[in-house]
Swiss-Prot record:
Pathway(s) annotated for this protein in UniProt: Porphyrin-containing compound metabolism; protoporphyrin-IX biosynthesis; 5-aminolevulinate from L-glutamyl-tRNA(Glu): step 1/2
Protein name per Swiss-Prot or TrEMBL: Glutamyl-tRNA reductase
Protein family: Belongs to the glutamyl-tRNA reductase family.
UniProt gene name: hemA
Keywords recorded for this protein, A-Z: NADP, Oxidoreductase, Porphyrin biosynthesis
Site for Important for activity, residues: 78
Alphabetical list of InterPro entries matching this protein: 4pyrrol_synth_GluRdtase, 4pyrrol_synth_GluRdtase_dimer, 4pyrrol_synth_GluRdtase_N, GluRdtase_CS, GluRdtase_dimer_dom_sf, GluRdtase_N_sf, NAD(P)-bd_dom_sf, Shikm_DH/Glu-tRNA_Rdtase
Gene Ontology terms, MF aspect: glutamyl-tRNA reductase activity; NADP binding
Record remark on domains: Possesses an unusual extended V-shaped dimeric structure with each monomer consisting of three distinct domains arranged along a curved 'spinal' alpha-helix. The N-terminal catalytic domain specifically recognizes the glutamate moiety of the substrate. The second domain is the NADPH-binding domain, and the third C-terminal domain is responsible for dimerization.
UniProt-listed Pfam families: GlutR_dimer (PF00745), GlutR_N (PF05201), Shikimate_DH (PF01488)
Amino acid sequence: MQILTLISWDFKRNNNFFNQAVLNPYEYWADILEKNGISRYVILLTCNRVEIYLRAGFPEDLEAMKPNVLHDEEAIKHLMEVSSGLDSMSLGENEILKQVKEAYELSVRNGKVDKVLSLIFQKAIFVGKKVRSETEISRGKVSVPSIVYDILSSRVVQKVLIIGNGMIAGEIAPYLSGKFEVTIAGRNIDHVKDLASKYNYSYTTINDLHELIMRNDAIISATSSKTPIIRREEMVEGKLYIDLGNPRNIEDKPGADIITIDDIYSVSNRNGSARMESVDEARRIIEIEMASLMNKIKDVMIDEIFADFYKFAVVVQKMEIEKFSRMHPEIPASDVEAFAHSMINKVMNIPVMTLKSVARSQSNQDFSRIFSKFYDNFSDLVSAALQSYEGRQDTQSLRDRTRRLLQRS
């Protein structure tokens, strides 16, 4: 029996199809699932991944996009690694845990989760929090923008000048929003205006660079220039200079407070090494929580199938009560019903508890295989039992008869 299927595209694998998949909004994926009769799912969409978690079925429409496909334990383990930050571009990032939580909550609001799917995602969110609180996986910044932000925050800095409007400048700009007064400067006023307008920053050209340096506390140079942008004679004492260029954008000057891209990388590598040391510890936490979760899933699946069996027992109970009441009209029907109900509960309690105990001693694969066979044949077994019980030998569909009897109950 299928517990969970993951269909995914991400930045690590199948890049060609990922570039296509990541452009599609939530509604696109939900529409495909619904058209394929799939109603229990969670869709996780980020800049680096498209992941669709299903309880049952498989949308054949997506096969042409060559997705990664994982089933059951592998799919659940992957989700826990994602929520823990082990599968992120930046190891241990915090944002992904929030994104997993939001994806799950959206499916809850839309009525797209069942008990098993809820168990899986609630556990994954719990594991993500536990890994971060009990390991160093998220401690210490590793990205250039976050390290630059920490450096600025540790100094007496209010006004920041960013020189450049390329990729690095674009990555740093959002980190400073709301914290510093930022001006973006470059050679092309239209280009810097486009970047500055996203965050309501000031913008200008670098025609009078010395004056710009005078007006700001920290100067970040992030251009691809092959020659220095800031020369010694333009530098002002008491300013913080952060040079993210390669080659260098800022000339050396004795006594100047200059932090280079090599200094940034040194911090990143040091913090990254500390995070890597936490990976094994994080995986141990995932392994322990996986075992706990799988036992809960087994319990839920057993409860669900015995709930169907209980419905069958109620059908039989009603028939027997009717017969007994005709034979003994002097006994109140309510007393007979109470007695029968109590007997069913007591009789069923032992096999349910026993099966749960046995299930926990079986490997997850063995349990899934055995349970699938039992579940797939259950309706036929109940139908045959009903036919035998009623003593009827007609051509009516056993499955239809069972369904009607269960509805009557």
